[in-house]
Design a protein with these regions (language model features):
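Elongated alpha-helical scaffolds that mediate protein-protein interactions in large eukaryotic proteins
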Residues: 2-205, 212-221, 230-246, 261-264, ...
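Long, low-complexity intrinsically disordered regions in eukaryotic proteins
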Residues: 224-229, 246-256, 271, 289-290
Length: 651
């Protein structure tokens, strides 16, 4: 490398050829393929000039030929260049700058298949090491180049293989691109099954170092990075019980209490939601518990944080519908969805804490609890208003219309819909995370809080609930679980039942119930069948609430299809999971309740189903008795005994 000339001298030797593109191309090939570093350097300098002039942008074939002519080892040597007895500081800087500039341009111009090859991805480690002594302009180019490389899985794996990421970590508080590189690397690599463990190890190694690096700053960039990265990780790649969780939450708490900017509020909201989703067992207590070491006169942190989230939601709703077609709506929707997710988690944590006397580290005075209850109720009422307006703008056109009464639709590539000008042109309502999170928080609140007015308001969304339930099998988001949870709270009131039946809700959930029976008994796969069975249990609870309500005199004729469907159930010889067993028992309970409450004539028409139902009870008893959980086994056996007695009385 001692014989290498500075970049300027190499460029001068090739300038004469620039006027002849063919001669230039051949000269560059010759120089780049030479065995000596001096010629290679001259060729590289000439190549940079040609690339900067844009002469090869529209010639992918020649671009690829020149890329293949480059020696990867030579590029690595240039990237490693540093000042010594033989190389001046200026020359070493020129060498690094030249290699970085050429790699940066090629990373942009090369087609995807070439960017996946080792010839480019193998430069990741030398590029990271070159960050140590690079000036700001070169550092920025290096980071942009690495970011392009790791946007594909092959490049992401190269970052995972680097043992020392300290050059990247140490500049992360000055260059957000460094955090973007880590995010792309982890999320892309996590999609490869064989790399999940490596991703976990890398995260556990890097995040503690990042926490130290951002110490003494407001850490907004870092907190935002973790909040955006965690939800994109494959669930299996998220580290289990990480040691960095507690110090990370301490950073989040510090940001919340420091009167942050709008960017800071977005960052802590999304991080809190991401951590609660990834670590539902450990994070709620770490985030919401009272810090006894603080000022005893100060309000609990959980009160402060939840109150700030509620204020953000309430202040955002009035102008949100007008922003549906604006560029800022997706970001606002994401932030408010995260806020609702945090509030949902807090409500669950609050209920558990009040029920469990052993939870001693959560304390909130009665007056603060009452104020929080009032604020949450007010926010949920505004939430209902927004959901109503958003749905009407998107689908219904007017509150509560039965689907058959909707008119004025226009054909689009996605079916027919009302041509209302305020509906989002690109964000369908059934793909809006804010709608899902808003319904989820509302469902939890009306179930836990005895607020009849709010339940009646929620019942006014019944047309939206039923339609979204049907659309869940087609869209990217699954609304069925929060909707079923909301229905449990709504079915306490007669207005809720009338609205549900008026929108054909029974038929919609019954169709889902039949599909769940097929998936759990005919072609069961343990994981999916258990998830489906859990949803089936929720459906049964909703339907039982309707049947048992004082407003329901007798079951309708069409409801009795549940009985014939249950008699066709197949109990598998191999013991299913406990939740599937519980679901099958619940189906028997639903059927016997329908038969018990039916009128005389209807009972006679379906009395032939009783022997088949009794046979199912007998089939399930040995399976239940052999369950691993003895407590659950005894409870289900008692239910089966009750069902056997009810069916015997129906004969």
């Amino acid at each position: 490398m001692a014989e290498s000339s500075p970049q300027s001298k190499g460029a001068e030797r090739g300038m004469d050829a620039l006027n002849d593109p063919v001669a230039t191309f051949e000269k560059m090939q010759e120089l780049l393929k030479a065995k000596d570093d001096t010629s290679r350097f001259v060729g590289l300098a000439l190549l940079k000039t040609v690339l900067d002039n844009g002469q090869l942008i529209n010639d992918p074939q020649r671009l690829r030929i020149l890329w293949d002519a480059l020696s990867p080892k030579f590029l690595d040597r240039l990237l490693r260049a540093h000042q010594n007895e033989k190389v001046s500081r200026t020359d070493s800087k020129d060498m690094v700058d030249l290699a970085v500039a050429v790699l940066h341009t090629f990373s942009i111009l090369l087609p995807e298949e070439a960017r996946r090859e080792k010839r480019l991805t193998g430069r990741t480690a030398p590029l990271v090491k070159a960050l140590i002594q690079s000036p700001p302009d070169t550092t920025k180019l290096i980071l942009q180049t690495i970011l392009t490389i790791v946007s594909l899985s092959e490049g992401a794996l190269e970052v995972l293989a680097i043992q020392d990421l300290s050059p990247l970590i140490e500049i992360s508080n000055q260059y957000p691109l460094a955090l973007d590189i880590l995010s792309f690397s982890w999320t892309n690599a996590s999609a490869i099954n064989t790399e999940v463990e490596a991703v976990r190890n890398s995260i556990n190694q890097v995040i503690p170092a990042l926490i130290i690096n951002f110490k003494g700053t407001d850490a907004v960039t870092f907190i935002g990075f973790i909040g955006n990265m965690l939800p994109k990780l494959e669930p299996e790649a998220a580290p289990r019980n990480p040691k960095w969780l507690e110090p990370l939450i301490m950073m989040l708490r510090k940001l919340v209490t420091s009167k942050p900017t709008a960017a800071g509020r977005t960052a802590y909201t999304q991080l809190a939601a991401a951590l609660l989703q990834s670590y539902p067992a450990t994070c709620p207590s770490l985030l919401f518990q009272h810090d006894a070491s603080g000022n005893s006169d100060s309000k609990p942190f959980s009160y402060l944080m939840v109150n700030l989230l509620l204020i953000d939601i309430r202040s955002s709703f009035p102008s949100l519908l007008a922003k549906l077609n604006s560029e800022e709506y997706p970001a606002i929707s994401q932030r408010l969805a995260a806020a609702f997710d945090v509030i949902s988690s807090f409500i669950g944590f609050l209920v558990r804490s009040l029920d469990d006397e052993s939870v001693s580290r959560f304390s909130m005075t009665p007056d603060l609890l009452l104020k929080l209850r009032k604020d949450i109720a007010e926010t949920m009422s505004l939430n209902i208003e927004y959901l109503r307006d958003r749905w009407d703008a998107s689908i219904a056109g007017a509150s509560g219309l039965h689907p058959s009464a909707r008119t004025g639709t226009a054909a689009t590539s996605e079916g027919t819909r009302l041509t209302l000008t305020w509906e989002s042109m690109k964000d369908n309502v059934n793909a809006d995370a804010l709608i899902l999170a808003g319904i989820g928080a509302l469902a939890i609140w009306i179930r836990e809080d005895e607020n009849e007015n709010l339940r009646n308001e929620t019942a006014g969304l019944m047309d939206m609930f039923v339609d979204l339930y049907k659309l869940s099998s087609q869209g990217t988001l699954d609304f069925r679980y929060p909707i079923l949870l909301a229905l449990e709270g709504i079915m306490i009131n007669e207005e809720g039942i009338d609205g549900f039946l008026g929108q054909d809700g029974w038929l919609v959930v019954f169709e889902d119930l039949k599909s769940i029976l097929r998936s759990t008994t005919e072609q069961p796969t343990i994981s999916q069948s258990s998830i489906d069975a859990g949803r089936g249990l929720q459906i049964v609870r909703v339907l039982l609430a309707i049947i048992d309500h004082e407003a329901t005199s007798f079951p309708r004729e069409d409801w009795m299809a549940v009985v014939t469907t249950t008699t066709s159930m197949k109990v598998t010889a191999t013991p299913p999971s406990s939740v599937i067993i519980e679901f099958l028992v619940a189906m028997l309970q639903l059927s016997s309740t329908l038969l018990s409450k039916s009128s005389g004539g209807m009972t006679k028409r379906y009395v032939t189903s009783v022997p088949a139902l009794s046979g199912l009870v007998k089939q399930l008893k040995p399976i239940v008795s052999n369950m691993d959980d003895e407590v659950e086994s005894r409870e289900l056996m008692a239910l089966l005994d009750d069902e056997a007695l009810v069916l015997e009385n129906l004969r």
